Amino acid sequence: TGLSGSGKTTIARALERQFFDQGNTIYMLDGDNLRSGLNSNLGFSFEDRKENVRRIGEVAALFARAGFIVITAFISPFAEDRKKALAAFKDNSYEIYLSASIDVCEKRDPKGLYKKARLGEIKDFTGIDSPYEIPTKPALILNTDKETKEVSINKLYKEITLPGKMSS
């Protein structure tokens, strides 16, 4: 979880590649691929954001029950929704917080979403005019505005592959 532009998709894709190259069955769910398909009927209201995260959790659980390692890369702005989504996985899930300042996220913004939000063209944009609840007890915090992509990926990989962390 983290703001738009914090590096969620970048880190998730690299981690997916690392696990795949080791022969694992893995799938990454990303905000863009679900918003353009399964969740295309949802907007960005409070209720729609809650429903978006609920659906993500359900889809991720289906993949996990089928034996996949599942990586989700979503803003997921509300703590209660993240908690519910993670509950489906019992002890075999990790909330990872990608921390980056709003200034850095805006500079990284390839789609110009922050600019549109600041101009009022996008309403309820997380971090601008809609809240983001920072995780209080994530399994790991990646400071993506202070460390390289490679450092973040290595920290994350080490955290989730510690003995006893992943079930086979």
Question: What is each model feature region?
Answer:
Residues 30, 48, 52-55, 81, ...:
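Helical mechanochemical/support elements of P-loop NTPase systems and associated helical scaffolds
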Residues 13, 53-57, 79, 83, ...:
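Generic alpha-helical structural signal
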